Each structure stands twice: as structure tokens, then as C-alpha cells.
Amino acid sequence: MTSGPDQKVSAPDLFSAPRSRNDVVTFLLVCAVVAASFLGRYSFDVAGFTVRWEQVAPVGFVGWLIVNPGSRLDLLRTLRHPVVLTFLAFIAWNAVSTVLFSPSLGKSVAILGWLTIDLLLLAGLMSLGARAVWAENIGIRFVVPWAFAGFAMYLIANRTGGGVSWGTNFDSLYDVYVTRLSATEANIYAAILVFWTLLLVARKGTDRRWMIAAAVTVPLGLIASQTRTAVFCMVMGLAVYVGYELVRRRRNPTPLRAFTFGPVAVVVGVLVAYGAATVLPDIGTERPSPSRHETAPEVRTDTSRPAQDKLGDIDFSGGTVGFRMAVAREAAEDIQGVHLWFGNGTNTFGLRHEQPGSPGVSGHIIMLPVQILYDAGIVGLAILSAFGAVVWRHVPWRRRPIAAAIAATFIAAATLTSMFWFSVVWIILASLLRPSSRDEGETGREAAQNVVEEHPSALETTGIERI
């Protein structure tokens, strides 16, 4: 059943009334998909390929949608949605570039397969219509305990000198253990915290207790990750969100407190946590006592820097930024002639280059814009840009401010770390694209504006009842 522009739908609450077995199974599989998105570090090998649990869960979820007669038609309709088709075109172009230029199809196929799983995950969640809010609700509930656990492991790992270091990595450049928890790396851990917190902020204080809890724990998690980009992206994302809401408020008056409570709470939390980090004891100096099997204890050299130095160390000529610039220069050597337009094949940089300063280690570009240009050329970058434009067109009008904030945050973060392939990105995207629900409050003038400006989404052709 097709609904009209800005048709409000109810986001079902699984526990508010008895539901069918199909609904229960779908809900549990959505839970599994979101939970697996927090477990990016865990994987296993199959036929020489590394398979991640965050890839397995979406396959099971989409498989259920296919075999279940009640959801199969919705999924098939969603596969014709412009967002899905545009991303499919991007994958197809990557496949063409890979066949033409990749020196190892196996390495490229692994990433192409991952992108295909992302496509199916996005289509599957979109096909749920209003029920896609389940994924958003679950992710928002995960973020507080995940942030708190990350900060706890950061303190434990550094106070024990790595004696207990689960969920952390040692940054030898700054002599500090940084939190990644169950994510692939600290940058990804921090980015996940930022994205889910922004979605929580967009709820405009409807769950103030959880918002306050996030405002306390998420900044601690960012400090634990020791990721400067994440702190910057969090503040920038909040600024974009508030700025967009203020501009729109001129035409559609809304209570100022409704959309400023969350941003103010988080910014205060970031400032307090950042300030507290500067006065923490030098937690990087503690080391476990040498055992009887050790002939000499680890010696801290004069060049070692204290742990809290990392967040305040903004160095564009060396350190992390300098390393990425070195990688970009190596990549630029291959982005010439026909390869500038058509790329070098998906995931092929490591087949041609070693990591700067790490002989024998396959190179990784890490920076998403450079990665796309290297893999798929200007054509691939243009298709991906078109994908972004199509997504923007189909985001409901009331969700545009937070969509702009997340887009700006993702673009900024992607210049230093690429999480494009990870499932959390596609879960967040599906949350932005889901139909508007009745709990997304608005004033009378705003509602009238929506009827004129919001484009009807194909998500609303998934059998959701009119109300």
C-alpha cells in the first residue's frame, strides 16, 4: 500500500502487544545484526577468506526476509529503490575496474563481496519500513554501556601496563593503550560512539535520562580511544545539527530547548572529560613488575611521551597525519592516465605497496576519498557522490538536520579512517531513510512544510498501514 507524501506511520513496539512469530524472529535478527556491528574485530576463515560476524548476521537476516512470504515481496520492491540501485551501480563499476586492472582477483572479490552484503543489509532494513526503528533503538541502547566499558578497559590497561589489556591496542608512538573494545581499531570504536550519539541527540530530549547517561559516558569513551578526529567530529556534527535546526526554525518555529538539550549536554560532557584527561596521572608510566623469566624490565626512554599527550598533539607534519600523507603520496603514483578515470581495481593498493615504515606489511590507504579514487577512479567517485545525493533526496524532511550532521561527520572521519564497509554505516543509513513516525514531533507550520517538501519514500510501499 502506498502512502502519500509525509505519511506518518507508527513504529511498532514488539512488546506493547502480542505479535506474530514472524515479527519476533525479524526483531531478534535485527538485534543480531546490530549486536554484530559492534563486534568488528571478530572473524573466522572460510576457504581462504576472512569472514566477520558482522557479515554473517546480515546474511542470516536477509535470508530470513527471502524465505518468509510476508517479507519477501517488500524486499523485492526495495531492491528497486533508487538508493539501492545507485549503490548497486557503484559495486558494479568496482567489479569492472577490478576485472580490468586487479593483479589478484581474490583480494578484490573479498571487498566486493563485503560491499554486496552491505547492499543487502541496507535493502533488508529499508524493506522493514517503520520497523527499521528497531535497529535504531537497539544501537542507541548499546552505546552507553559500550562507552563505559571502553573507558574502564582504558584505565585498567594503562594502570597495569598492559597486564590486563583486553579490548585495547598499544600505541607505541605515544606510549599509551587505546581502547577499541570489540571494534577493529580505536578509530572505528570512537566513530561508532559518535554516530549513535548523534542519532540519540536527534530524538530531541524524548529520553532525557538516557541522553544524560550518554553525555557522561560517550565523552569518556572518546577519551579512552585517544582519537582526536572523533572528538572533533562529535563537536562538528553537533554544530551542524544545531545550525541546521536554527536555520529551519526561522520558517518553522519549534521550542529551542527541544533540539539544544542533547547537544549542550554532550558538549559539556566532552569538555569535562577532555579537561579531566589533562589532569589524570601519567597512566602510561605504570608497568607490571618483571617476572622471574624476564632478564630485564622495560625501560622508558627519554623520548617517550606521557599518555595524555596524544589528544593534544596536533601535528600535521608527523605522527598520524604525516603517516597518512605518506600513504596518499604513494597512492598518487598509481592514479595517473587511464587509472585516474577508471581506477586500479578494488582493494589493490596493498598488492602494489608496503605500509610506509613497515617493511613486509601490505599497505592500506585508510582514507576513504583516496581509497575510492585509487580503486574506482573518477568514475567510481562520481557514482558514489550520486549515491549520496540520492540518499539525501529520500531522507524524510524532519530528519534532514541529523542526516546533514552524520554526513559531515562521516566525511570528516573518512579522511583519516575508512569505515565505509562496516555494517554500522548501513544500519545508520537505513535509520535515516526509514519513514517518519508519529513520535517525531513537529509543529503545525512544520507539518505543512513537510507536505510540500518531503519526497515520498519507497520505504512507505512496504505494506505499512495508514493511520
Label every PLM stretch briefly.
Residues S20-V30, D74-A89, A135-F142, W210-M211, ...:
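Membrane-interfacial loop-to-transmembrane alpha-helix junctions, especially the N-terminal start
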Residues V62, L198-L200, A404-A414, S418-E460, ...:
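Transmembrane alpha-helices of multi-pass inner-membrane enzymes
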